[in-house]
Amino acid sequence: SDLTPADEERVRAALPEVGLHFVFVDPAMFDGFPESKRYPRQIYYRIAAPLLLPDTLERILYLDADTVIINPLTQLYAAPFGDAYFMACTHTRKLLEKLNAARLGMDEAAPYINTGVLLYNLPALRADLDMERVRAFADKKQDVFLLPDQDILTALYGDRVHLLDSMVYNLSDR
């Protein structure tokens, strides 16, 4: 949201072989969301992505900036969603799922979503994603958040995630 036209031009010049489309994000969309120095409002962009991106897109793959890609992602990107909203990895065991469910006020435990590698089912999310619901949940639970974006996605959509093999798609030291 704070990129200037000059910034955009520098990025385009650095990557002439890549087609880029910049999306303006209205900061007002996130008014009232809890923020901190460590977790600014931009963390909510990945939650709101289905509403911010063109309707012509049916899926997107989000990768954290520190993700190292060593194999093609073609098979992952083309994988069928079934009724899942996301494909992602988890790095928690069953006991931690129960603790996270209690911490986040969930009725039932669900896998804790690691958002470092996140494939989105955009049509399904567009039909169900309610940013007011996200804002209300974030406001209510902000005092117990550990990783706000992951906490929100787990609590609100953890039952709609297709788990990926973390040894293949999101190996982590956590």
Put a short name on every predicted segment.
Residues 36-38, 102-108:
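Short, P/G- and charge-enriched loop/turn segments at secondary-structure junctions
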Residues 31-35, 95-100, 173:
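Short, charged, surface-exposed secondary-structure boundary motifs
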Residues 7-53:
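Active-site-proximal specificity loops/subdomain of glycosyltransferases
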Residues 24-28, 42-96, 119-120, 126, ...:
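GT-A fold catalytic core of metal-dependent nucleotide-sugar glycosyltransferases
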Residues 36-40, 95-96, 140-141:
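Short, flexible loop segments at the rims of nucleotide/cofactor-binding pockets, characterized by
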Residues 1, 23-27, 89, 164-167:
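Conserved beta-strand termini and adjacent loop/short-helix elements that scaffold enzyme active sites
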Residues 2-10, 97:
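Short, charged/polar "capping" segments at the starts of alpha-helices
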Residues 91-94, 110-174:
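Catalytic core and acceptor-binding pocket of nucleotide-sugar-dependent glycosyltransferases
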